[in-house]
Amino acid sequence: MQTVTLYQRDKMEDKYMAIIKPFVAVRPDAKVADRVAALPYDVYNRAEASKEVEREPLSFLKIDRAETQFPDSVDTYAPEVYDKAKEIFEDMVSDGIYITDSDECYYIYSLVMDGRRQTGIAACASVDDYMNNVIKKHENTREEKEQDRIRHVDTLSAQTGPIFLAYRSKKEINDIVSRVMEQDKPLYDFTAVDGITHTVWKIAEKSDVENIKKAFENIGEIYIADGHHRAASAVNVGLKRRKENPGYEGTEEFNYFLSVLFPDDQLMIMDYNRSVRDLNGLTEDEFMKKIEEHFDIESLEEAKHPDKKGKVSMYLSGKWYMLTAKEELLNITD
């Protein structure tokens, strides 16, 4: 069977148009949503994840990090760990912890942290848009981290972590989002243990769904703000399923991946800093010479944010430096 590509060509501007589609959600029952909610899987080490799952047995982390259900002697990436994740997920669906909606919808997802609200739309993005660079990337990925999420998503046949996407704000979408938030009762509204308030509304009106879909087609480029490994993993699972189903038509769920899209005027990009406790036995002079092997070093009078890829601000012994990666370092995966 001839396969159907998932992108459209805008003949007027000769560009691809993004496909951001509604989906049938498998989501927590409202009575337990605050208990199911969990931080991203990769912010915990194994011991911390086990402790969190012990504290809250309904936490999604129990699915995301199923090695918590095994003794430490079992490897984190053992096949039985992924099988266990699938078993837990299916049991929770059977027990009504998760429910399945009946129609394809978009969902408004609003977060409030320290009094600041950020609101986006949960939807499915296209594997082909990722492959054709309609969805822009700005980070490299590590294969071992990708493989973990590939096995997880493939075993569960479920997208278990949304990709954080950003797009240029569009009035047509904003108007629908504002109206639904004002008029409709939210599906969920709770404050998690980390103090962040999560509120979700469903966009179910067919005219709203269609208008949002059309509005996204005219957005142009979309950017990955966070979740490069999750995105690459989801796409690889989609490509794997295509090979396994050579007659695929393009409408199958594996051709899409779960995302939350935020307009640019809602975004607050926070620093992603690292604190190093010691110099691993080196003196400061020795440490700076090691740094100089791979970076050009500029002394600064005060703190300064990096303004492009390959630059790092460093604070050492009361002084700021700007490090600029040398050419041979820029092509190494992070």
Indicate where each model-derived feature is located.
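Surface-exposed, charge/polar-rich loops and edge strands
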Residues: 6-9, 13-334
